[in-house]
From Swiss-Prot:
GO CC terms of this entry: cytoplasm
UniProt-listed Enzyme Commission number(s): 2.7.8.7
UniProtKB keywords: Cytoplasm, Fatty acid biosynthesis, Fatty acid metabolism, Lipid biosynthesis, Lipid metabolism, Magnesium, Metal-binding, Transferase
SUPFAM superfamilies: 4'-phosphopantetheinyl transferase (SSF56214)
Keyword Acyltransferase: no
Binding site residues for Mg(2+): 8, 58
Name of the protein in question: Holo-[acyl-carrier-protein] synthase
Biological process (GO), any one: fatty acid biosynthetic process
Length: 131
C-alpha cells in the first residue's frame, strides 16, 4: 500500500468573494447534493462550508498530482456530511483516481482567522499509483 496526500489552505472571504462575483461558481464547484447541504447553512457557516468543499477538492487534485482542469473536475468530486456530520469524499468520472483503495478527508475551519485547511489522503494499491 502507498499513500498520496494533498493539503490546501483557503481564505473563506476569498471564496465568498468569488461566489458573489461569479453566478456560476456554485454550479462549477459543487454537485447538486452539496448545494442542498449548503442551502441549510446560515451566516458564517454558509461560506465556511463552501470554502471547505472548494479547498477539499483542491487538496484532492493535489493528491492525485493532476490539478484541477486537466483530469480533475470539481463536480466529479463530492464531499457530503455523513449522519454524524463527518465529511465523506467520493469521486466519479475522469477524476477517479485509479487503484485508489480508500479516501480520507479532514476539514478544519478557523472562522476568526478567515481560514479553512483541508487534507485528503488517498490509499493506493501498490504497483500503479497513476491513473
Amino acid at each position: 500500500m502507498s499513500y498520496r496526500i494533498g493539503i490546501d489552505i483557503e481564505s473563506i472571504s476569498d471564496v465568498q468573494a468569488a461566489a458573489e462575483k461569479h453566478k456560476q461558481f456554485l454550479d462549477k464547484v459543487l454537485t447538486k447534493s452539496e448545494q442542498k447541504q449548503l442551502a441549510g447553512r446560515k451566516g458564517n457557516g454558509y461560506y465556511a462550508y463552501l470554502a471547505g468543499r472548494f479547498s477539499s477538492k483542491e487538496a484532492y487534485a493535489k493528491a492525485t498530482g493532476f490539478g484541477i482542469g486537466s483530469k480533475v473536475n470539481f463536480t466529479d468530486i463530492e464531499i457530503l456530511d455523513d449522519e454524524n456530520g463527518a465529511p465523506r469524499l467520493s469521486v466519479s468520472g475522469r477524476s477517479l483516481f485509479l487503484n485508489a483503495k480508500s479516501y480520507q478527508i479532514s476539514i478544519s475551519h478557523k472562522i476568526k482567522l478567515d481560514l479553512v485547511a483541508t487534507e485528503v489522503l488517498i490509499e493506493v494499491e501498490d504497483g500503479n499509483s497513476d491513473s
